[in-house]
Amino acid sequence: MNKIAKTVLMTGTALCAAGVVLSTAGYFAGGKDFTYTSDHMYVSGGNSSSRKNLTVMKKEQIDDFTKLNVDFEDFDLDIRTSDDDHYYMEYKLEKNGRKNPLTWKDKDGELTLEESAGGSGSYYITYDLGIFSTHADLTEKKDALNTVVLYIPEKAQLSEAELQLSDGDFAADQLLCKEMTLELLSGDLMLDKGEFEKFDAKLSDGDLNVKELQCTDNMQLKSGNGDVTIKKAELADGQIALSDGDIQIDNSSFNGDMKINSSCGDVSVEMKNGSAEKTNIYLKATDGDVDTEGLSRGKTDNEEDTSVYENKAGASAPTLNVECSDGDITLTESEK
């Protein structure tokens, strides 16, 4: 046997031995939880042992409720419009062991949903042994996996909703609620239509996308790292604060005193046609520009690092105050 052949043989033998050692170590380190599905091996992003290790609730009618409390660690929450006048719930959740990952109680008009320690994430890795390739498939949650779905009648209004999601998204077709409190530590908020009296939302790391928002009393929004987009807004008193991200509010009207503060990012506000001249407006951009082209009233003052625009409409008029520390401010009016 020549020298090259011996080298190849010795290398192959060493690699095979290393593979056996690593496989054995992996087995006792948790690899025994791997399951074969369709000639593939599957590993959940948590410690779930199988795709089949799920707890499933098919769409089922639940008691009516006017108060909603949610406390999730990894799950998403999706609120959809019911096809009738009844309330429903469904979910398909991965389990970590035998414990049900969700506990819920619907009593006296109050629905409480809590994620237990038995839940797991929805990201997974698949090893395709058939073609000897490995790939990480960080998928979107398909078929509502690890998502709790609630169905609420179209005209139903909640009196209170308190939602806290640590690592999950919140989405809703429509949500009518008198007092809404929401905290997302790492996740996005997606809302087609929201009508509230009081709206208090905190997003640490995620985007907010709302198609239509109405807040008749007070709105408080704090965003740490993410963009805020509202396509249509009717707002009264409130404050919007962004640490790092852009904000865009289109087709908007302000009926109270609204303050917008951005530490790092651009602010773009489109007001309804003809409403700017009837609003007390103060815009200040530090290390940025203020663009109010197209507005017939108000005055602009530009200094070395600061741009200011101001319009005075009277003491009884609503107020819009926007300050931006590192970014531009754009204020326009919609077309007629």
Say what each PLM segment does:
Residues 192-194, 199, 208-223, 227-336:
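Short, surface-exposed interaction patches in beta-rich subdomains
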Residues 9-26:
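Hydrophobic membrane-insertion alpha-helices, especially the h-region
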Residues 26-116, 122-123, 141-164, 169-183, ...:
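Short linear S-[DN]-x-LW-Φ motif typified by the pepsin-like aspartic protease active-site region
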Residues 1-7:
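Positively charged n-region of N-terminal signal peptides that target proteins for export
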Residues 107-119, 284-295:
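Conserved long hydrophobic alpha-helices within structured protein cores
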Residues 122-141, 294-312:
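Acidic/polar low-complexity surface segments
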Residues 180-184, 199-202:
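Loop-centered beta-sheet repeat module
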